[in-house]
């Protein structure tokens, strides 16, 4: 027997098994009225009520429903209320400007747009058939108690469209099917051990890969979900303490905020020997990994993936064989991107690009057949990342292919140089880029944010690197910055950091 896998399965199970359990804790500090604490039974009723409200608006199945919001119970409701009854949720990055959001709304063909109240002034003029401000206005969609129009489940139907951040071009809309999301949720849940004794904290933006798919995995297992509107280190620790949080996800920048807050925390760090933190978005330095385990007492788990892969491709979680390792030795092993998740096949092509196959890799890019064909050429998904896979199956990223620095004919991995600089106690953030050089083609430049009141010079950091890595890999110059350009999910925007140095150069390499 075979039945279609759709995300309504997760919602139906939560209602049946955990209907009386508080499943959603809404953000109390938000411009809209908080929905408070919702049981999974109430959450189901809201989601179905939203589907019924969309019926009343005349939206056909397959219609797109956009939402631009920070983390909230209403955003979670939209992910299920739109998709679980046959429509398509389009969660949009709330940090984008009006032109960018308008492009996404227009390109995806949204019939409905729900806006965070803080964004009404900047995004309120975007043309769309039905616009609602999140809160009392959008709550008019919730026809609680009404039966939504039946939908014949189709696991190959598009459930969400998630727009990837563009570099030189417009962003692409990643189509995720119900099967994609279902597979990612199940596999993510297996590997991270999601169970009904967990409490999950939404530190990830829920627009980003649908909160990496955790809303589906946690809902299916009846896990209470705590919303957090804005990342703030001290507040994260407070909520972990208040709600008994056991699981959270984030980029390395979130880890840094938590470590900074922990240094000022009075008393034992909340969640010690209980919290599992899943990190992705950039390869974290080994020093950071070690600090998570020694200073916080939390388990560090690294994953690797992309929006196009829902996102889980690989996972690196401490193994029994590593139990007797020193924290530093274990951190070094955890700094790799990990082994393929269940159902994922990985390979590299002759140029070193990482390739992948699996059930949760995108259906296609929305209305972009050329990009879809390129990304899925030869029945592999082409990640655009360069890496190596060892005999045990562990992937180690070398760099984004376009970020490899070639100096004097030698390839330099910016990740390796960044990891070296991160180990210096004065360095809080760093980005390593290649800049044009008449003699060498490119030379290595480090852009550094110094932590606190630390006093360090350009010469100090260059000499520090020369003691640790091959001289040809070391920066020839260091520039100190107050901050580094990042995406909403914490990734360094190296194309922005490189651009000023390559102005007037015909190609982006020398």
At which residue positions do the language-model features occur?
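Conserved AMP-binding A3 loop
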Residues: 37-42, 159-183
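AMP-binding/adenylate-forming catalytic domain of the ANL superfamily
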Residues: 470-491, 510
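AMP-binding/adenylate-forming catalytic core of the ANL superfamily
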Residues: 96, 248, 358, 363-364, ...
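Conserved pre-ATP/AMP-binding loop-to-beta segment of ANL
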Residues: 4, 19-22, 146-163, 170, ...
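Conserved AMP-binding/adenylate-forming
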Residues: 223, 277, 284-303, 307-395, ...
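Conserved AMP-binding/adenylation subdomain of ANL enzymes
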Residues: 182-199, 207-247, 261-262, 318
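ANL superfamily adenylate-forming
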Residues: 27-36, 118-155, 262, 328-330
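Conserved AMP-binding/adenylate-forming core of the ANL superfamily
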Residues: 3, 23-72, 76-80, 97-102
């Amino acid at each position: 027997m075979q039945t279609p896998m759709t995300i309504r399965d997760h919602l139906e199970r939560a209602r049946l098994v955990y209907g009386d359990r508080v499943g959603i804790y809404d953000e109390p500090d938000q411009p809209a009225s908080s929905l408070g604490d919702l049981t999974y039974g109430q959450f189901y009723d809201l989601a179905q009520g939203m589907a019924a409200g969309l019926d009343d608006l005349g939206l056909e199945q397959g219609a797109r429903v956009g939402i631009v919001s920070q983390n909230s119970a209403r955003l979670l409701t939209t992910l299920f209320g739109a998709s679980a009854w046959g429509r398509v949720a389009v969660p949009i990055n709330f940090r984008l400007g009006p032109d960018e959001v308008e492009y996404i709304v227009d390109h995806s063909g949204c019939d409905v747009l729900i806006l965070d109240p803080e964004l009404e002034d900047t995004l309120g003029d975007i043309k769309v058939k039905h616009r609602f401000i999140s809160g009392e206005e959008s709550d008019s969609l919730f026809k609680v108690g009404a039966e939504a129009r039946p939908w014949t489940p189709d696991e190959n139907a598009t459930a969400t469209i998630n727009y990837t951040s563009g570099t030189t071009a417009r962003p692409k809309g990643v189509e995720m099917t119900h099967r994609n999301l279902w597979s990612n949720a199940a596999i993510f849940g297996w590997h991270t051990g999601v169970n009904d004794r967990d409490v999950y904290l939404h530190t990830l933006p829920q627009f980003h890969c649908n909160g990496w798919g955790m809303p589906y995995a946690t809902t299916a297992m009846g896990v209470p979900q705590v919303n957090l509107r804005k990342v703030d280190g001290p507040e994260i620790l407070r909520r972990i303490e208040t709600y008994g949080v056991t699981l959270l996800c984030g980029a390395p920048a979130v880890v840094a905020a938590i470590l900074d807050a922990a240094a000022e925390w009075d008393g034992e760090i909340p969640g010690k020997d209980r919290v599992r933190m899943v990190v992705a978005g950039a390869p974290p330095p080994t020093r950071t990994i070690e600090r998570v385990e020694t200073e916080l007492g939390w388990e560090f788990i690294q994953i690797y993936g992309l929006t196009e892969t829902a996102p889980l491709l690989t996972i690196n979680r401490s193994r029994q064989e590593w139990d007797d390792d020193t924290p530093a030795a274990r951190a070094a092993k955890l700094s790799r991107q990990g082994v393929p998740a269940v159902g994922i096949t990985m390979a590299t092509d002759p140029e070193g690009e990482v390739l992948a196959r699996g059930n949760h890799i995108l259906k296609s890019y929305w209305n972009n057949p050329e990009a879809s064909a390129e990304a899925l050429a030869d029945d592999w998904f082409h990640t655009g990342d360069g890496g190596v896979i060892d005999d045990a199956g562990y992937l180690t990223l070398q760099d984004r292919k376009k970020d490899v620095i070639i100096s004097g004919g030698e390839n330099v991995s910016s990740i390796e140089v960044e990891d070296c600089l991160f180990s210096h106690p004065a360095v809080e953030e760093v980005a390593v880029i290649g800049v044009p050089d008449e003699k060498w083609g490119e030379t290595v430049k480090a852009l550094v944010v110094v932590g606190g009141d630390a006093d360090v010079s350009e010469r100090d950091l260059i000499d520090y690197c020369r003691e640790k890595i091959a001289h040809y890999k070391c920066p020839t110059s260091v520039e100190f910055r107050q901050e580094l350009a990042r995406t909403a999910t914490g990734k360094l925007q190296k194309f922005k950091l490189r651009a000023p140095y390559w102005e007037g150069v015909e190609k982006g390499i020398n």
